[in-house]
């Protein structure tokens, strides 16, 4: 191995190890909330659950993932779930889910907008479909806080004119 490669490896390895330790999917069941927050930092949101607490780590608006870390009543990690995928988005129940349920499952949206033909907000989430196909989920929430419609579109390419993200 050349001297340059050894120097590169010496600097790169610690960076890779730090990056891996800050990934929610690398956490082991049973970890305490304090250990989780020491590793990942403060969550972007905290939600009460019937059986414990959900710590939410969102990569929105720039990223395409939201990790839900569910803790039991004793504050121990039970489950890590990357919730922004088509399977979970398609579980949204039109005319039943509320703004709070969307927030608890998917966190804060990347964008909140209003459109002319809908009386309410449109929450837009960035997510990836299999094989890294970038998509947007537009969740229409009326003024009473009820989900009325979900529309899926392709995310504009970075070089598209007028790209908002």
Protein language model regions, located:
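Residues within mature, well-folded domains
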Residues: 21-165
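Bacterial N-terminal signal peptides that target proteins for export
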Residues: 1-12
């Amino acid at each position: 191995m050349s001297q340059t490669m050894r120097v590169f490896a010496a600097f790169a390895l610690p960076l890779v190890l730090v990056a891996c330790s800050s990934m929610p999917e690398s956490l082991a069941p049973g970890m305490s909330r304090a250990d989780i927050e020491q590793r990942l930092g403060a969550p972007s949101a905290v939600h009460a659950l019937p059986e414990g607490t959900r710590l939410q780590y969102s990569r929105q608006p720039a990223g395409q993932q939201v990790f839900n870390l569910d803790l039991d009543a004793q504050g121990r990690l039970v489950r890590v779930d990357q919730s922004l995928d088509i399977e979970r988005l398609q579980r949204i129940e039109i005319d039943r889910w509320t703004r709070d349920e969307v927030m608890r499952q998917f966190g804060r949206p990347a964008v909140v907008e209003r459109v002319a033909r809908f009386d309410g907000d449109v929450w837009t989430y960035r997510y990836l479909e299999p094989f890294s196909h970038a998509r947007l989920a537009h969740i229409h929430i009326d003024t009473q806080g009820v989900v009325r419609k979900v529309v899926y579109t392709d995310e504009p390419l970075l070089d598209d004119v007028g790209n908002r993200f």
